[in-house]
Amino acid sequence: MVTLDTLRREKKAEIIRLAEMSGCRNVRVFGSVATGENRSDSDVDFLVDLESGRTIFDLARFLGDLRDLLGAEIDVVESRSVHPHIRDRVLAEAVGL
């Protein structure tokens, strides 16, 4: 099971490296992993800022890289595209690595 502590202590450097390769900045975790309510089958939700000129293909690459690294289901959301109905909750939950 992926935990916030594991991400911070064991995977942070590699996650940041992968993010930079894909043009992702300000990597944060939100959802059940961030709140400590995750289970063994929980996915890991990442919130990122995408550099200008980057595309959805860069996000998809980052998502695939994270899936390979963590061995878990992953969601990657660009901060400007968070749905307005959940934006406040996502931003309140989001924690940096």
Regions found by a protein language model. Give the residues of each.
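Conserved histidines in hydrophobic membrane contexts and catalytic metal-binding motifs
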Residues: 29
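Catalytic core of pol beta-like nucleotidyltransferases
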Residues: 1-26, 34-40, 51-97
